[in-house]
């Protein structure tokens, strides 16, 4: 069985500046890894390269997910293949409630998989059960996505979104930043 994610001798640059210089990493299904290092060491660059963000160029090496190279895939294709990137600073979405956002994301995935959309009442029960474990209350779920949220609230909501992701590989940038011990 192929590793979930395999990075082979990855070199990448931003403009004319080389950032990643020969990264090798193998992650098997079910494993949890932490990428740590000082500021400017390439952690964010690696996540952006994995997600296929514009402006980041792979100059050598390969990225394989379940044995398939991702280098020629656009970012949306990488997401459909199983890549999930939770950004350090999630954007605010004024006018879009958290519950509506989560349900739209779940239903988009269900439709793509040929499944029926989830019933609203069933979804509310599911969200409340998952959110409870993250100390997220109904008020937070009704608020516009990330609007006026503290750093800890934003991160708690990132974990909530992550819990609804069916992606096989999740890359969370600074996942504990701003979180209180109760989260």
Locate predicted features.
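Hydrophobic anchor residue at the start of the ABC signature
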Residues: 46, 158-160, 179
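Catalytic Walker B motif of ABC-type/P-loop ATPase nucleotide-binding domains
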Residues: 170-174, 179
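The feature captures the beta-strand-to-loop junction immediately N-terminal to the Walker
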Residues: 36-38
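Conserved structural motif at the start of ABC-family nucleotide-binding domains
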Residues: 5-7, 20
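Short coil-to-beta microelement around the adenine-binding A-loop and adjacent beta1/P-loop entry
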Residues: 17-20, 77
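ABC ATPase NBD Q-loop/coupling interface
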Residues: 62-78, 146
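ABC-family P-loop ATPase nucleotide-binding domains
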Residues: 91-168
